Amino acid sequence: MELASKYNPADVEGKWYQYWLDNKLFSSKPDGREPYTVVIPPPNVTGVLHMGHMLNNTIQDILVRRARMEGKNACWVPGTDHASIATEAKVVNKLAGQGIKKTDLSRDEFLKHAWAWTEEHGGIILKQLRKLGASCDWDRTAFTMDEERSESVIKVFVDLYNKGLIYRGVRMVNWDPKALTALSDEEVIYKEEHSKLYYLRYKVEGDAEGRYAVVATTRPETIMGDTAMCINPNDPKNQWLKGKKVIVPLVNRIIPVIEDDYVDIEFGTGCLKVTPAHDVNDYMLGEKYNLPSIDIFNDNGTLSEAAGLYVGMDRFDVRKQIEQDLQAAGLLEKVEAYTNKVGFSERTNVAIEPKLSMQWFLKMQHFADMALPPVMNDELKFYPAKYKNTYKNWLENIKDWCISRQLWWGHRIPAYFLPEGGYVVAETAEEALKLAQEKTGNTNLKMEDLRQDDDCLDTWFSSWLWPISLFNGINNPNNEEINYYYPTSDLVTGPDIIFFWVARMIMAGYEYKGDMPFKNVYFTGIVRDKLGRKMSKSLGNSPDPLELIDKYGADGVRMGMMLAAPAGNDILFDDALCEQGRNFNNKIWNAFRLVKGWEVADIAQPEYARLATEWFESMLAKTAAEVADLFGKYRLSEALMAVYKLFWDEFSSWYLEMIKPAYGQPIDKATYEKTLGFFDNLLKLLHPFMPFITEELWQHIYDRKEGESLMVQQLNIPTACNEIIVKEFEVVKEVIGGIRTIRLQKNIAQKETLELQVVGVNPVATFNPVITKLCNLSSIEAVENKADGSGSFMVGTTEYAIPLGNLINTEEELAKLEADLKYQEGFLQSVLKKLSNEKFVSKAPANVIDMERKKQADAESKIASLKESIAALKK
């Protein structure tokens, strides 16, 4: 195969991805090797690739490809999530565009539309991941609502219900008035809002003086649900209200004044309106004091008949209207600007409504007790470890999980209501009928007598089983696959779903497998733009990942992402990083073409080449060991940088320059073969990060057989490093740098040979052949005193000199040195003048004076050196 003169990703990426697929190199089956298992965080089935997915899946692919090359049986399982709220909202919007309301359809009719939508739009994101180079076992692709996963979810619900861990009851829940469903606490995001604090007057019933009790509230629209006023019994300013009753403004309902030390004496007036149906804390007070509960809201956030006033109006419109009406009635004392935190639905971004509702809940304390210790004792490791505290805090304050959703798209709750009240829970309708007959003692009950619960389960109730259900470990608990692949190895995810998903998977793992679901969790950061802003459609600062791949190539984009992606820290993404990645691709390509372009001859290996190969062998070993260590610590960005520097700095800038034959001359066979071996190992180190270009070049190093691939080669890079050679060569680099600086300063062409004198013992004599070649030297000799008129430099404690003789124009050089001397002497005088100024010395900070003294010492040193050089030239 001929290698193109320029690297064009489009010619390479599709070709090799198809080759990997055709040869089933991504597929995994249980065997005798150590398994390495990763399950993809399932993206929404109708989603498209964004920068967060790019980062997350690049990291997963790097880990998976590295594991394959370490000889492990790597299994990366892809899949998608049915995303109840998001998908149902999209289907509802699509139907609305056709003039169809969800309420016009039966459940089955709506689900036909939802499945059609899913089949049309679903799976796009997984196809897009292929462009990135994701080496998933595509034959294992799963969907949270496919048959196997659905059976698992229903089986788990029934099991937990039978264990007494799932219950049904009326509780205060977070209600989403747009999605028309309950949400779990974790699906509520609290935002700071610039609100108002309304001071409302509640007349005291039967008060001869006509006094008012004043209540401060941010929600005057809920007064129609007030059933009590509460004061703190220890509040001196409200003692007069004890035992009284007050009248709700506008509503004219008489309600009691109750006492509880829950009330904050300092907030507002110290009087609290109690609305048990619409506030979590009020609900608890209502339970404690047996207060009536009046639900004044419809599910869509409009006021219900129970409100009595403003019926059918939206809650926020009522807030504006009631302010005017209270003002007109003389029942609004004042309004203040107020900043408070308001809960919003994570999915619809609508303010949630605390609402009493009949829902299904999962008791969480049992799970929290199992899931906390393994993380805190590092049996299951978090990277970075700082997230352990976030996890601990949530588990120690856990509340029961509201698992029911008032949606149709999802796993329908397997509860069946009986004609005379009550219900049964079963995996199938047939089992439910049998249970119903047993429970009622009525053997004549038929299927049509039972009504299945209309609600579906929270999406996370299916994805918490993901590491188990992907290997059918719920339906068939001891099958070969679950026993081999579980627990999985690494989970790569964002910290934003640590509660939604990570913690719950750990709980499910211990409940159903008695073991952790994964050994390590790598938390990625949030992808931000270069100004530090979170990427979003509204800001228009989120690039299209596929456009980036078209422009820079998948390897360029992968490298750009990883250069900016330290574990757990937010990444500041800039297209320039992808450009750096593309430039590195070109560097690798050009280096390979250079090596493959050399003529090879069966000649003796020069000493400089032998030294070069010996040195680079140690550099390669040292970096391979460093990279292995960094992978072990999940510091992938640093691992990439280590390989990048090895290739760019050590291999390209130094090694290839050392061994490069003279123009028109061949390279010896031994050095050439060694160099190809180095290239082979460099490609192995780079492959997990940059799979496409490395595969293309690896296929060109030697003739390969059909089906062979770099991605399944074993790393096997020796890690024994000769530290003495490595350290010595760092000195050699400085010596070569010193010689090149003199050439540059004195304007001496590279073709002019130079002599190098080493004053005293030469610490790098071993590398004389390398220095001679790279610096075009005629000789290197150790001397007691350097020649007059030499240019010299220090490396460590050793002085190196180059006799300049006829190589420079003495008059020009003298003029240059004398001009420099004049400048330095003038500079020294200005510093001394400052230091002799007593006012300056007494008032200036110590660090400023130290800086001036350093300037003095530096100038004096330069002056001495310049005078020495001038004297030498005048001899």
Swiss-Prot record:
GO terms for molecular function: aminoacyl-tRNA deacylase activity; ATP binding; valine-tRNA ligase activity. The keyword Coiled coil applies. GO terms for cellular component: cytosol. Pfam families: Anticodon_1, tRNA-synt_1, Val_tRNA-synt_C. Keywords: Aminoacyl-tRNA synthetase, ATP-binding, Coiled coil, Cytoplasm, Ligase, Nucleotide-binding, Protein biosynthesis. GO terms for biological process: valyl-tRNA aminoacylation. Catalyzes the attachment of valine to tRNA(Val). As ValRS can inadvertently accommodate and process structurally similar amino acids such as threonine, to avoid such errors, it has a 'posttransfer' editing activity that hydrolyzes mischarged Thr-tRNA(Val) in a tRNA-dependent manner. NCBIfam families: PRK05729.1 (NF004349), valS (TIGR00422). Belongs to the class-I aminoacyl-tRNA synthetase family. ValS type 1 subfamily. This is Valine--tRNA ligase.
